[in-house]
Each structure stands twice: as structure tokens, then as C-alpha cells.
Amino acid sequence: MSLDKKKFKACMILAALGYVIGFYNCIYEFNNSNDFSINTIGDNYIIEGSHYSNYIIFDFINTCGFYNCPLPNMTISDDTIFHLSMAKALIESNENNFLANIEKNMIKEINTPDKILDMINKYRIGNVTLNSLKKLKNGDNWLKFQYKENDGGTGGCMRTMCIGLIYPNINQREKLIKLALLSTRITHNNAIAWLGAITSALFISLAINNVEPSYWIFELMSLLESSIIDNIVQENIPNDYVNYIKDKKIFVDKWKKYQQIRFDKYKFKEIKLMMMPNYRSKFYHDMFHFNNNRIYPGAGGDDSVIIAYDALLDSKDDWEKLVVYSMLHVGDSDTTGTIAGAFYGAMYGNTNISKIMTKKFNMTKELSNIGLQLYKTSIKLADK
């Protein structure tokens, strides 16, 4: 089946837009404009937070709406920058040099004190990503980084969408897995982060092939039940294998729980209450029981992709619904927004997307060009 280059472009553009809206200059992400304590964990937190979701939605509508976002004044993120740098590495090099070029491009983004300050103050780079890149800049070998129990965050799953674009074919699945895993390990040495990154790339590869979204979870579960990922870990990073198996169970159990609640055999179950922001927030809280180090919905390499996927299933090809469900909620809204935006673009292209909005976005031209180059790269790799 021939691939649609417009969807490659839309995937890159809407991933960035999803982040910009979900972040909104750090106002929406993690509810940084709210006055309740972020140390409140459990039902008290989620009751306050879920009602705050309503405020975010009304504030978004009042401030700009779905068609008049003040995009020139809305900041992109470190994750968008790293997604772009990864995409450029894939475009500019051959397969044998993908990882080396990804590492080189990421280090470039922090290679001066001014760039580091911009990353911290302007783009709000995550501590895990920044600390890892500083080590690389100082000459450390990322293959020797220690496994970290608390590094199962979202840095990987927010930048591997481009890998799904260049490896869309079934016979490229192992290449997709290996590259998503190892490129994530550069900054996040934890199995939950690796598996989230693999899932993002996998779902993009399915979307770009027009596979119905409700089927994606079954492809994922089949992959997780196989030994394919296990073998890749054992062959490439054997010292991390025991920890990988332990944390893989956490990842798999969350997806199994999600599948049991939201699917009836092979059919997605619509829950009408999920259209209510407070119910949706409570649903994610009850389902994931946040770890102490990640109290926000969507802050992990596991639940971030689940929330983005769930939002896509509930939204179908309605962009406005996707914005509300994935970008305007309590928690790590920029993470879930960028992943959901990428899923939408790869699956539906520009369907129901306002031309006014993309025209106002000052990165549309650059992202469109990178999407086109990724399309050409995918064609080139498919011929090998």
C-alpha cells in the first residue's frame, strides 16, 4: 500500500501543536497556574485537580479557542526540539549511523551555556534528559549509564514518533523496536521509558498504514507477549535485562488493565461519562494509582501513551475533541498532547484541522519539510 506524504507532514506538525497547546507557556502543564499543593497525593489531589480541568478548558476557549490560538506567542518545548533533532538525524544519515547522529544532534542543543539556560528557563527541559546530555557532552558513554528505577518518564515516547514514520512496514518491526529502545536509553535508562517509546513508534507505524486505531492495542499486546523485545534487550544491553523484566511487568499490567476496562473482546467500549473532564481525570487516577515520584496523569512512559491513545479512540477524527481530551487536562498535558497530536496526524492527516491555526504556527513550514524528508527516507529504507 502506498503511503500518504501529507500524513507524514501532519504527524510532525500536529505533534508540535499538541505540545504547544498542552504546555501553553507552562500555564497548563502540571497546572502551574493553580494554587493547590503539588504534594497532595490521592483523592484530595484528584478532586481539586479534576475540577481545575474545567477551568483549563474554559480558559483555552476564552483565550484563543480552537481556531485563533496566539501561536506566535506560545513556546515550543525541549521535547519538540529533540524530536526535530532526532528526525534530522534520521534524514541526514544512513542506518548504521542513526544512533551516533541522534546523540550528536541532541548534544548540539546544549553545547553552550546560553543554550543550556534556554533549555532550562525557556523550554523547561526535564532533569533526567538534561543530566544525561551533560554526561554525554563531557564524554561519557551512554551504553555504560546505570539503570535508574525512577527514570521511567516520557522523554522517549515524545520523540520516537519519527521512527514510526521511517519504519512503517511489518518487516521493519525489529529495526523500529531497537532504534526506539536504544535512542531512548541515551537519556532515560528505564524499561518503562523504553517500552513507552516503542509503543509511540509502533502506533505511528500502524497509523501511517491506515490500521484502525482500535486494533493497535492488540498489535502491542501481541508484541509484548512475544520474545522480540526481550531478545533485543538481551543482545544489546544484557546488564539491564533483569531490571527490564521487572519493570516490563509494570508496563504490561497497566496496558492489560486498560484493555480490560475499555475493550469488549476486540471492540472499544465507549463510556459516555468520559466526555466529562472530572470523570476522565478520576478514571486515570483510579486506573494507574500514581507512583510517588509521578503524581500527575501522563507523566510516565506507560500512562502517557495510554492517555493519548484513549483520547484518540474517544475523539476519532474530531480534532477539537482530541484537544480537550489530550491537551487540556490535569497533569502532564503537553506530553499526552504531543503524542495524541502525532497519532492524529499520522492517522487522519489534516482532517478537520483549521488552516488558520496551522498558518499561524511559525514552525509549520519547517515541520512540513521535515515530514516530507521523513517520507522520502521511509521510501529509501523500504527499498533496502
Residue ranges of model-derived segments:
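Structured, active/binding-site neighborhoods that engage oxygen-rich ligands
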Residues: 1-384
